[in-house]
Amino acid sequence: MTQYFDGVITDSAGRGTVSPNVICLHEQDNGIGWKHTNWRTGRAVVTRNRELVIQFIITLANYEYIFAYKFNQSGGIVVETRATGIVSVVNIDPGKTSDYGNVVSPGALAQNHQHIFAVRIDPAIDGDHNTVLEETSHRVPMNPETNPNGNFYEIRQNIIRESQWLDAAPQQIGRAHV
């Protein structure tokens, strides 16, 4: 079942206007939660993983931006942003190319650009007795006794004690915020 809620949109002066039915709440499948095959009987049991999604879409110029806050069954929160819409183009002489974009059709250049998003999360849901952790995976040096194959790593936790920025860029491999 999908449920829609009103949202408040602010203008450049900070005045709020209620917009009806602009926030969507729904549950969706998130792959396999767990699976096990009994090797004696050959029978398999599979349980699906579900996630609760709060989503809204905004239109800015020629793009629609989709923001989805996904709450999974293990207590994790994933913030997903997606862009859709129509690429803005400028004229380019036929047969020419540019370092500043890609020719997408004869005479049409889509300029190079990027989309940058910032997310603010208030972890004080249901009170202030919560803890936000940053977890980082660190490889453990090879050791003949404790790590002979070099595949051992450890998780180091850093408690976030005050408001600050955190780098959640995808290239930060091995980092999670929980």
Label for each model-derived stretch:
Residues M1-H177:
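Beta-strand/loop-rich accessory regions of lumenal/periplasmic or secreted enzymes
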